[in-house]
Curated annotation (Swiss-Prot):
N-terminal signal peptide: none
Active site: E224
Cofactors required: Zn(2+)
Protein name: Endoplasmic reticulum metallopeptidase 1
Disulfide bonds: C177-C195
Organism expressing this protein natively: Xenopus laevis (African clawed frog)
Enzyme Commission no: 3.4.-.-
Residues the entry annotates as binding Zn(2+) 2: D190, E225, H327
Positions of the record's site feature: Transition state stabilizer: Y326
Length: 876
């Protein structure tokens, strides 16, 4: 058939719709056709989209309220006093940056903690006993974090406090925090507040007249920021480690807010049940657990160490709000609300007491098997059930959906309507709308990135909603509106509304089955999106569906969507609260606008799927499409004009740009030991996609002419502190005189031994600052077969290089290690290149006049973290 629109002739497909589907009511075979009821073919009015918008905003408001639950300090009978914990927090952070190995960390912070523990011990109730042990372990291990590297530590500091019944205990639960910080930061949220909470919990429990059944070990670990060294030292070497049956790890990926349970287990479902029973203000998600364990978040915690090296199950909690100032100078005690401390203290105290008085702790091996589906409901309570039960529920849900769809197929077939064809076409149209919206958003993201305006939403998150969210929704509506006009012409609005409701069921049934089949507990998420809407549809009275007021129908329909919609919006908040700040420190190679565009598309698809049927019920969608398109285009123009600056120096809510400044002296030695190259300068790394484009106007000498070259040397010839060179490929090297260093690193080959099995073993000795990194690159035809580190099997950090992270406490002897290489051919140029990076984070050598001068030039919306380092390369 043909129609004329604005002078254009449009040929529509020959698509015959039965009279039954056109009129919008059904007639079963063999049943007398009833009088045609009043239809809604005229379509819903313009007020319905407004109602949908108000619905979305109302749900978002409820989520906001649930996340801002105020907890009055001392207002609960848990026994936890947030005011006391806050005093501890303030005093701990008054100690300067507590880098492992520094006097601030190894002496001042340790003495402070020991003093407070002694004060608590003096007030202990006679039913308890406290034992304190200061551990200074030495050890080594390999980890596959950040591409894989090996760690070695010497004489670091842990403080372990055991609270147990008067007559001792055989089993224990471990509570872990760390009091060290990354360089140049006060580390209030990461992780001083957790240590303050643990001190107050220790005081509360030890003064209680209620005896414990099991011991609680409070571990204040002093080297977590050295990539989990402190926890490894405890769990592999401390005699109390054998007592531990479960642990709670307290961490941070943000500053303040609610602490999220984002990892549990492995297996041991009784731990989830313990949290669900004892946490006063729960905040937990199995979805967060499976996202974190997928590795897409570039972070790790002590949970991994206790799980992998101690074979102990546990609970991992972290503050996730305001990650913009995580690991910056803005992570100060005054930014953490007392209510946040109270909430965390109530939860952790409750769970620790529950575990320490539970019979399950001693017999945990009997309850080991199986995973749990768990999630909190707006912070009110935790809903949890065994994963095997979840599997049954999921498959039953899928089967009921299949039965429902099959029944409709039979009914429509008897009535002469080709429902199966419509269903297939509808699924294709839905997929086309998804792909079309994704392509549109990616095109916009690429344009923004090419225009040099990436991260424009970093400080103004609403910009991303207007820019990408509006475009996505407009494209969804446009595709379905075109399908309604030119593909489903002649079909009744009620029939199409029902059809796309069924398509929504099928849409979520597919991931439900796939995730369940993969053993992922997150599948419950999609089960909820099927169960509640389907139940509502089945319970709706036919007169409401076919004859009732559009607003009555809409209200009842939205009421059925409310549980999954609220739960999804709750998770959507968590996704953007976590990932938006991460995109400001994810390196120079990942376009953040493209990643955010993907996230917005994914969340929009989930939130809008059950609204698609309204497109087919509305009289017109033209104004909605135009409004959304104009909003997106206008936002794009404002973004490209530079209207929205990415960073902020606001005192209330700073969102700084992160930059590393390393005053570096590089020395390259030949095979004979001669110095073949030496230079010095300030090596600059920006941790986000914008590089230094926003910094150059403030520091003209810092431009593309001083881009750092990638030398043919391990890790491009620069002293990387962590193996993140694959994430940050753009860096700058501003020439400067050598930094004054009081004590240079002494790196030497002690001996060389030819082994009977044809390998060459090189013995090294290193004496230097508390933090050093060694990079090993075997030459052509040479294989690094073993070494004296980790488990003896070398772990590569890339295709050719091996990364070793070394740290020591206040004092340590020279570090000795060996590597073994096998060479298949005689090489005149040697068999291996070894380089050592030395990092001076504290003391007289940590700064230089040139570094101070450059740092002062950086704008106030940036956070330059600076230190002095050296890079020495040797060939053997």
């Amino acid at each position: 058939m043909e129609s004329t629109v604005d002078g254009l002739t449009i040929r529509r497909p020959r698509y015959n719709v039965s009279a039954e589907s056109a009129s919008g009511y059904r007639r079963e075979a063999g049943v007398r056709e009833e009088k045609k009821p009043r239809q809604r073919d005229a379509g819903f009015g313009a007020a319905v989209p407004v109602l949908l918008l108000l619905y979305v905003l109302s749900v978002r408001g409820l989520v906001h309220i649930s996340l801002r639950q105020l907890v009055t300090p001392g207002g609960h009978s848990t026994g936890f006093n947030a005011s006391t914990a806050r005093e501890y927090l303030q005093q701990i952070t008054s100690i300067d940056s507590r880098t492992a190995g520094s006097p601030e960390n190894e002496i001042i912070a340790v003495n402070y903690l020991l003093g407070k523990i002694k004060d608590i011990e003096e007030k202990i109730n006679s039913v308890h006993r406290i034992t304190v042990d200061v551990q200074r372990p030495t050890g080594t291990f390999s980890i596959d974090f950040l591409g894989g590297f090996t760690s070695y530590y010497d004489n670091i500091t842990n403080i372990a406090v055991k609270l147990e019944p008067e007559h001792r205990a055989e089993h224990a639960v471990l509570a872990n925090c760390h009091f060290d910080t990354v360089a140049n930061t006060p580390g209030a949220s990461d992780d001083a507040v957790s240590c303050a909470v643990m001190l107050e919990i220790l005081g509360s429990l030890s003064s209680s007249s209620k005896p414990l059944k099991h011991a609680i070990i409070f571990l204040f670990n002093g080297a977590e920021e050295n990539i989990l060294q402190g926890s490894h030292g405890f769990i592999t070497q401390h005699p109390w480690a054998k007592m531990v049956r479960a642990f709670i790890n307290l961490e941070a990926a943000g500053v303040g807010g609610k602490e999220l349970v984002f990892q549990t287990g492995p297996e041991n479902p009784w731990l989830v049940q313990a949290y669900a029973s004892a946490a006063v203000h729960p905040f937990a998600s199995v979805v967060a657990q499976e996202v974190f364990q997928s590795g897409i978040i570039p972070s790790d915690t002590d949970f991994r160490i206790y799980r992998d090296f101690g074979n102990i199950p546990g609970i991992d909690l972290a503050f996730i709000e305001n990650g913009y100032i995580y690991h910056t100078k803005y992570d100060t005690w005054d930014r953490i609300l007392t209510e946040s401390i109270q909430r965390a203290g109530d939860n952790i105290l409750g769970v620790l007491h529950y575990l320490a008085t539970s019979s399950q702790l001693a017999e945990s091996s009997q309850f080991r098997h199986g995973n749990m589906v768990f999630f909190d409901v707006c912070g009110l309570f935790v809903l949890s059930y065994p994963a095997r039960l979840g599997t049954i529920i999921n498959y039953i849900t899928a089967a009921v959906t299949l039965f429902y769809i099959s029944k409709k197929m039979i009914k429509y077939k008897q009535g002469g309507t080709n429902y199966v064809r419509d269903l297939v076409y509808g699924l294709i149209i839905t997929l086309v709308s998804w792909v079309s919206a994704l392509v549109t958003v990616l095109i916009i993201a690429v344009l923004v990135s090419l225009a040099g305006k990436a991260l424009s939403w970093y400080t103004h998150f609403y910009v991303s909603i207007f820019l990408y969210g509006s475009a996505a929704v407009a494209k969804f509506i446009l595709v379905h509106s075109l399908a309604k006009t030119y593909f489903f012409a002649g079909a009744s609005s009620q029939y199409l509304g029902d059809l796309f409701f069924d398509i929504s069921l099928i849409t979520w049934c597919i991931p439900l089955v796939l995730l369940t089949q993969s053993g992922l507990c997150s599948a419950y998420f999609f089960a909820a999106w099927i169960i509640f809407p389907l139940l509502t549809k089945l319970l709706l009275q036919p007169d409401i569906i076919h004859q009732g007021s559009p607003y009555k129908f809409t209200a009842v329909y939205l009421l059925g969507l409310f549980p999954p919609y609220l739960h999804t919006m709750y998770h959507v908040w968590a996704v953007f609260e976590m990932f938006t700040p991460i995109l400001g420190r994810s390196g120079t190679e990942i376009p953040p606008d493209i990643v955010l565009g993907f996230l917005i598309i994914a969340c929009t698809i989930i939130l809008i799927t059950y609204f698609i049927s309204f497109i087919y019920l509305l009289k017109s969608t033209k104004k909605i499409i135009v409004t959304l398109a104009v909003l997106s285009v206008l936002t794009l123009l404002l973004v490209c004009s530079g209207m929205f600056f990415p960073y902020s120096s606001s005192n209330d809510s700073p969102k700084p740009k992160r930059i590393f400044l390393q005053h570096t002296t590089r020395t390259f030695h030949s095979l004979t030991g001669e110095v073949v190259k030496r230079d010095s300068g300030i090596w600059i790394n920006g941790f986000d996609y914008t590089g230094i484009s926003y910094v150059t106007p403030h520091i003209p000498e810092l431009n593309e002419t001083v881009r750092a070259p990638c030398d043919d040397a391990p890790l491009c010839g620069f002293p990387w502190y962590f193996p993140v060179h694959h994430l940050i490929r753009k860096n700058w090297y501003l020439p400067a005189p050598p930094a004054p260093i009081n004590e240079h690193t002494d790196f030497k080959l002690v001996s060389r031994e030819e082994m009977s099995w044809g390998a060459t073993r090189l013995f090294f000795e290193v004496k230097g600052p508390s933090h050093m990194t060694v990079y090993v690159r075997p030459n052509t035809n040479t294989v690094l077969s073993s070494w004296s580190l980790g488990d003896g099997i070398p772990v590569a950090s890339g295709e050719t290089d091996y990364f070793i992270f070394y740290s020591h406490g206040l004092y340590a002897p020279a570090w000795k290690f060996w590597i073994e290489l096998k060479n298949s051919a005689k090489e005149s140029k040697g068999i291996v290149t070894v380089a050592v990076g030395s990092h001076y984070f504290f003391g007289d050598s940590r700064n230089s006049p040139d570094l101070e001068t450059l740092e002062l030039k950086f704008p106030d919306w940036s956070f330059p973290s600076s230190w002095v380092c050296t890079y020495d390369l040797y060939e053997y």
